[in-house]
Amino acid sequence: MTNIRKTHPLMKIVNDAFVDLPTPSNISSWWNFGSLLGLCLIMQILTGLFLAMHYTPDTTTAFSSVTHICRDVNYGWIIRYLHANGASMFFICLYAHMGRGLYYGSYAFRETWNIGVILLFTVMATAFVGYVLPWGQMSFWGATVITNLLSAIPYIGTTLVEWIWGGFSVDKATLTRFFAFHFILPFIILALAIVHLIFLHETGSNNPTGIPSDMDKIPFHPYHTIKDILGALLLILILLMLTLFAPDLLGDPDNYTPANPLSTPAHIKPEWYFLFAYAILRSIPNKLGGVLALLLSILILAFIPMLHTSNQRSMMFRPFSQFLFWVLVADLLTLTWIGGQPVEHPYMIVGQLASILYFLLILVLMPVTSLIENKLMKW
């Protein structure tokens, strides 16, 4: 008799995705981040649901309701900090997942990669509107600064900003709609993640060598499920250590001051995971130019498959490309550091150089290096 998991219409879908899925035998721990992102998403939706039960999206009570969650709700403090630090873990996994895709040429799966880029934009939007909800100083001024960037759009900019605000400044209407967006977006992310998986399972996973591995596949369960569980345990361990020992390590102290439109914080900056893009935005002394650079810094990922010039898919056997990849990682870390610094000498010039290098690496240096490596392989 055939097992029910192979015949039942619903269980068959789950079985084909998580049990009998043919998987390359040589995929490393860098392939764990996809499942970790799924875990992060589920944790964020659950903690967010419980927070939404006690939160009030109103300018007069939002800050107090967050305080109430932390002080009066049973285990409210841990739910709140799991949600805040869970976002940081989400982005750590997200950037590792993207880095893996870049290094091993996973972007050759065009549909999967493009859905991934859309997912990145959606997650960034969710994190941004979520950061506004506690209605602290950084929430308010962050929302004001970032939404104001849209006013750089010629002709319709100002109208567009006021339309998003629901008034002439960031106020009650803005907070209410941002809460609505923050509630709905994770479910859109969930739907997109399923589409991401559907496209991935059309082709099967890539592997470190970048060579097709159809002749050497193993079932996903138990070999990779046990490996994913180990990764999940490590993720939960790190998240709990962060939440219980240093819950405010990655936050901004300014956000413990209620929002005040009459007092601007000394340094307005986003959460750490947006600092690299913020540094690129600030490095161009022109509003429209900065906004375009900010948009392109993320959108450039969609063009990566077209910029692939190598005869080999993975960077595993391409030392020069490997070197440039790690230069790119170092450059992004530099931009992240610069994004958190004030706009003054020498930070400005370092930020500008790092921004130029970022685009230069992706658009010129890496494709040209790949062509040189192709030539070397023929010698």
Curated annotation (Swiss-Prot):
Q: Which residues are listed as membrane-spanning?
A: 33-53, 77-98, 113-133, 178-198, 226-246, 288-308, 320-340, 347-367
Q: Name one GO molecular function term.
A: metal ion binding
Give the keywords, sorted.
Electron transport, Heme, Iron, Membrane, Metal-binding, Mitochondrion, Mitochondrion inner membrane, Respiratory chain, Transmembrane, Transmembrane helix, Transport, Ubiquinone
Details of cofactor binding: Binds 2 heme b groups non-covalently.
Cellular-component GO terms for this entry: mitochondrial inner membrane; respiratory chain complex III
- What positions does the entry give for heme b b562 binding? 83, 182
Q: How does it sit in the membrane?
A: Multi-pass membrane protein
The prosthetic group or cofactor this protein requires is:
heme b
Q: Where does a ubiquinone bind?
A: 201
Tell where it localizes: Mitochondrion inner membrane
GO process terms (BP): mitochondrial electron transport, ubiquinol to cytochrome c
Q: Which SUPFAM superfamilies match?
A: a domain/subunit of cytochrome bc1 complex (Ubiquinol-cytochrome c reductase) (SSF81648), Transmembrane di-heme cytochromes (SSF81342)
Query: Has keyword Acetylation?
Result: no
Concerning InterPro entries, the annotation shows: Cyt_b/b6_C, Cyt_b/b6_C_sf, Cyt_b/b6_N, Cytb/b6-like_sf, Cytochrome_b, Cytochrome_b_C_euk/bac, Cytochrome_b_N_euk/bac, Di-haem_cyt_TM
Q: Which annotated residues bind heme b b566?
A: 97, 196
* Superkingdom: Eukaryota
* Record family assignment: Belongs to the cytochrome b family.
| More details | Heme 1 (or BL or b562) is low-potential and absorbs at about 562 nm, and heme 2 (or BH or b566) is high-potential and absorbs at about 566 nm.
Summarize the protein's role. Component of the ubiquinol-cytochrome c reductase complex (complex III or cytochrome b-c1 complex) that is part of the mitochondrial respiratory chain. The b-c1 complex mediates electron transfer from ubiquinol to cytochrome c. Contributes to the generation of a proton gradient across the mitochondrial membrane that is then used for ATP synthesis.
Assembly, in brief, is: The cytochrome bc1 complex contains 11 subunits: 3 respiratory subunits (MT-CYB, CYC1 and UQCRFS1), 2 core proteins (UQCRC1 and UQCRC2) and 6 low-molecular weight proteins (UQCRH/QCR6, UQCRB/QCR7, UQCRQ/QCR8, UQCR10/QCR9, UQCR11/QCR10 and a cleavage product of UQCRFS1). This cytochrome bc1 complex then forms a dimer.
Report the protein name in the record: Cytochrome b
